UniProtKB/Swiss-Prot annotation:
Keywords: ATP-binding, Cytoplasm, DNA damage, DNA excision, DNA repair, Excision nuclease, Nucleotide-binding, SOS response. Residues 666-701 form the UVR domain. The beta-hairpin motif is involved in DNA binding. This is UvrABC system protein B. One of its GO terms (cellular component) is cytoplasm. The gene is uvrB. Residues 35-416 form the Helicase ATP-binding domain. Its main location: cytoplasm. Forms a heterotetramer with UvrA during the search for lesions. Interacts with UvrC in an incision complex. HAMAP family: UvrB. InterPro entries: Helicase/UvrB_N, Helicase_ATP-bd, Helicase_C-like, P-loop_NTPase, UVR_dom, UVR_dom_sf, UvrB, UvrB_inter. Residues 438-604 form the Helicase C-terminal domain. It comes from Micrococcus luteus (strain ATCC 4698 / DSM 20030 / JCM 1464 / CCM 169 / CCUG 5858 / IAM 1056 / NBRC 3333 / NCIMB 9278 / NCTC 2665 / VKM Ac-2230) (Micrococcus lysodeikticus).
Amino acid sequence: MSLAQKINRVVAPFEVISPYQPSGDQPKAIAELAERVEAGEKDVVLMGATGTGKSATTAWLVERLQRPTLVMVQNKTLAAQLANEFRELLPNNAVEYFVSYYDYYQPEAYVPQTDTFIEKDSSINEEVERLRHSATNALLTRRDVIVVATVSCIYGLGTPEEYIEQMVTLRRGAEMDRDVLLRRFVQMQYVRNDVDFHRGTFRVRGDTVEIIPMYEELAVRIEFFGDEIESIQTLHPLTGQVVREEEEMYIFPASHYVAGDERMGRAITTIEDELRERLQELESQDKLLEAQRLRMRTTYDLEMMQQMGYCNGIENYSRHIDGRPAGSAPHCLLDYFPDDFLLVVDESHVTIPQIGAMYEGDMSRKRTLVEHGFRLPSAMDNRPLKWDEFLERIGQTVYLSATPGAYELGQADGYVEQIIRPTGLVDPQVVVKPTEGQIDDLLEQIRVRTAKDERVLVTTLTKRMAEDLTDYLLEAGVKVEYLHSDVDTLRRVELLRELRKGTFDVLVGINLLREGLDLPEVSLVAILDADKEGFLRSTTSLIQTIGRAARNVSGEVHMYAGNVTDSMRRAIEETERRRAVQIAYNEEHGIDPQPLRKRIADITDQLAREDADTADFLKGMGGVKSGFDFGMGHRGLSSLDRAPATGEGAAAPAVDPASLPAKDLADLIEQMSQQMHQAAADLQFELAARLRDEVGELKKELRQMKREQ
């Protein structure tokens, strides 16, 4: 079955909307990347220095190529930041976010040494789950899609064919029995709930059926006249206000692992066959305990599947449900993309090794479970893709990195370089200093920087050294904080914001290579024990660390070392080469490097400013609360989801601000501001961003009301 035959894809052009035009090295890089891709080169590398605008270059490249794009990123937080950047640059296109939906995940495991079985335990983030469904929905219904994803995209997912087969197509004026539609919704794993109406449920009131698809925040109302669909409306689930009328709509299943009755029946039969074979094998080896354990667990799962259509851990039976042969690769997000999609690997020197490492780590745990009777052997086929399977599923690939790895450089025919920064900022000067008296020298340099209201990053090799250095600097009267692995993700971002604000002046850490540490206020990066060869002091790591000072006009890097290693020499030579290129460009074009004023690449910095603005604003309005409870709950009134393909912007607000009294509107602003902070605390950066935007619109409306009074 062709996906195109089943669904009418919306075709709209990618269009970058930005007040800026490509500058510096960007025009040359965009043109050369596009030429290489259009010429059919399979692998292309963009070596882009820190601060040269690689994300914007990617957006302009996608606009030129007009192809669905998957952008792979190394972790969730960076994926959220990059998705926000793309949404700003491509507001009329579908920019999706696909990462693991677990806030907490403890996979099931068995420790033979202590005879300890650890049950699977997890906490699912509902908003991230919605965004995952939104990504697959967008890929199947339109062409102008960019999905920003972590390596979660190579883990097993239901087949797109079955996902589409279970889909319901609604058309105004079409003949459809209401009860048949309700049964279809149940088969798609939606739950009827006439009281608590939320995402993944539907309710029925006479000839009116309402459902909130898993990938939407708004509800869909289907009104029948006999067996004819009289109208299809998108509406706000709380207020009931109609947002728009629909002529046609697709409702996709509530789970990526949904299967029809026929497919589930076949799966149950093949699971029973495998169980019999495995029990015979275990009993022939006198593993009676393992055989009994496997019989009990699998029989229970089979009963659940027969009665309910699913069971806990149903993904472990995905090979049977998909009808795949033993040892075959699982379906994953890559299978939802059209054949001509473009893959962009961000920070490829980190992301590529991640992809290759996923399979073995997962397999060693599952192998133990199978050997001791906790799972059937087919559970090992619920896994991430192997490296060669990943390569089979991708087409043309663009690798982005300031320090591309050996693999990328080996695959590509040379590389495209992007060194020149539009701002004119030059790579920092690198100074090598002796280790003798390094702490006293560092303390003196810190005092020089703090006197100028500048910030300092210090990177050490060990946790103990970082802790001791932090204590020493505190005793010396330096305002310092220590960034370590025990600090959770949101607190890390808060530390960066506090560093920028001047709450403290020095940040000490071990691995300060993360992209979130691009801080314009940092004028000095100190690298202790720079001559200790290893992962943290390799050429790649040193260049990445040097880049942390590349956002400041007077940036410097001090390497404390007893001798200059090969890694140090290569890193220094590359930095000097890039400095020379930028300086020559500045002189030729008469550019005077300007200090960079850049927000932290995350939503929390905006939230802090928004919070202060909202507090002042409401205070100015008299701080009167009406007591009106909008009852928005966790989801809020956010309607700024993916912009429609028509390019007309976001959906109309679900609540018309003009219809509310000023006091109620002020109360709504305060409630939504609280939800904005809660969303950020839950790492739901996309939801927080949408709430932030809506708060801004509501404040404009309230200011207008105030002027008219």
